[in-house]
Amino acid sequence: MKLLKTYLKPFAALVLACILLLFGQAMCDLTLPNLMSDIVNTGIQLGGVDEAAPAVLNQQAVDLLTLFMNDAEAGTFKNAYTPVEHGSDEETKLAKTYENIKDMDAVALSEDADVQAVGDAYGKAAYAFMTFLKDYGAQTGQAVDTESGVQDMDMRQLYAVIPMLQQMPKETFSEAINSAENAQSMIGSQVGATFTKLFYKELGVDLDAKQMHYIVIKGLEMLGIALLGVLAAVLVGFFASRISSGVAKQMRSDVFRKVESFSNTEFDKFSTASLITRTTNDVTQVQMLISMGLRLMCYAPIMGVGGIIFALQKSVSLSWIIALAVIVLLGLVVVLLNVAMPKFKSLQRLTDRLNLVSRENLSGMLVVRAFTNEKFEEARFDKANEDLTRTNRFTQRVMSITMPIMMLIMNLVTLLIMWVGGHAIAESTMQVGDMMAYIQYTMQIIMSFLMIAMIFIMVPRAMVSADRVQEVLTTELSIKEPENPVTLGNESGELRFDDVSFRYGNAEEDTLSHISFTAKPGQTTAFIGATGAGKSTLINLIPRFYDVTGGAVYLNGKDIRTLSQKELRDNIGYVPQKAMLFSGTIDSNIKYGKEDADVNEVLAALDCAQATEFVSELPNGVESSIAQGGSNVSGGQKQRLAIARALVKKAPVYIFDDSFSALDFKTDAKLRRALTKYTENAVVLIVAQRVSTIMNAEQIIVLDEGKIVGKGTHKELLKTCPEYREIAESQLSKEELA
């Protein structure tokens, strides 16, 4: 997590923007079921009547309703309405909506009225009146259908009985009023809306137009909010992609730069296949985690918590269904995590293994064919492939079974809500629109848990990848830059080994012991010895591919550890034991040693390296293409181009690590003669297996088991060094030895 925080810090503003947009998107998604509920409850069932109390009433309606209110409510209700005078501007304005207002004494709801209190009183009175009608009809044998009959009532007949009702004792209505007091406010508001439609119909209101207007307005609100939600989702996706790709780019760049600073010690710790996987696949996993995490990690909790809050606002009585669903989903997520997480953690290790086997097989294809071991390599690859496939198959099956289980839970919860909600609707304790919204909120809660499950499944693999990337980035370099590097200077000085010893990291014994010699400018110092004597190891200490564990190496009298690595290596022309070319052209490969080299310098280096002949025969000369790794040129040609690349630097020190082994004797001799002139002012170090390559060197150092056993010229060593003479006798004729 520390790694992610570090890389997300530059994108803090975008991350904050994503979180805010996710809140906005969640609020849009949570608002839509509410609007759908309003359309069903108010727009369809109540005909678009959404007023808590009618805006305009017939005075007779006020007289009728106040009979079914207590004194306090009646006072509040009457004070809330003011008479509309005939012929007034107010009446003219209201007549546009209430066409019959001029034919009756009307009252209008005051702007400063307490709408909530008036609405409560109105709803209770409407419910009490309906209860009274029902009870009165039962007593007189003239039953009133309160479900549909109320909507067809003739208000003039109701107003006609007002005087009779006013003569009745107040106690006559007390039972109906008490029933209304005890009833849920939702029932009162529903009955109130039914009576509002009657009063509006009496006033000449176009109820169909009112209903259509309400539905259209709510529909447009839904459309607008849906578009806002889509816009927020698009912006979140854009920002999340920008953040994740930016983090991945920086992380990949940092890993690459870190690997470039590795010495051979670090490369011994990390395999090439592993470093490739960490730079590509592991970074991609982290990128996916950031991209999906920004969208799901923040969105899922907001939706889950918001869905629960909005659902409880619709109905508390159904909350046990949500609790049951959440418990089942939590159990499912826990089971999935315990089953899938260990497998996800092993995926990256198995990917590493497959890459390693693939790389070894491809790079060693000729050897595999030479020993007819194709079947063995196929078996190795099949095992690595099968292990990865089996683990991938298991994790994919776990993930694929998650969705059907979630859908089953979702459908069962929907059925349960419809069953329980249906009974609540029948008992008038819940509205159809509220049940529909409740189902939507429950689906959103379940989908939130599905997203959380996906996150928990994705996080372990991504965190393993992040740890693997961090392992590379936090690897302590064995070769460090000096805090205050000194400058080497322009003079071509000598190279000196002063009692140098070297031991590989976990080795028990030194590979090199007490090595001391001086290589002077204008002279060739050669190294020879049996295989494993430490020749290449010694050479690798000069450009600081490894650091000495004892003694010191000096260049121009300065300890190379006090020089910056760039300055040190800029002063060395290095030809490795295994020639390596890069994809491009011959010219680009030669200029790899010196980017600003002109044509004459390139041609001079090629001429000295004895590469001019075969380069000139190519159709495009120095612009001829080189395949990856130099696979389209021979071993000798590749080695000569590698030598030319080092020579073009015109460095004060040249290192040839067994760089003439692929050359024939004739080319070897010509190259050495040309090299003597080309490097006349430089320190030349040659590691060789052939005595003929180094017999003219001013100084030959013989190594055996990491120690110097002989030092001198060819003739001197033949007399004084048995090890050198043994090597020489195995390669040279008696005449040459003489």
Would you name each region that the model predicts?
Residues 1-32, 36-223, 228, 232, ...:
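Membrane-integrated ABC transporters
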Residues 10, 141, 165, 169, ...:
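An intracellular "coupling" helix at the cytosolic face of ABC transporter transmembrane type-1 domains
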Residues 15, 69-72, 84-123, 488-738:
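ABC-type nucleotide-binding domain
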Residues 28-44, 216, 225-272, 276, ...:
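Juxtamembrane helix-loop junctions of ABC transporter transmembrane domains
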Residues 44-51, 58-65, 154-155, 159-162, ...:
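Short intracellular "coupling" helices and adjacent cytoplasmic loop segments at the cytosolic face
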Residues 310-327, 331, 337-338, 394-467, ...:
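Helix-loop-helix
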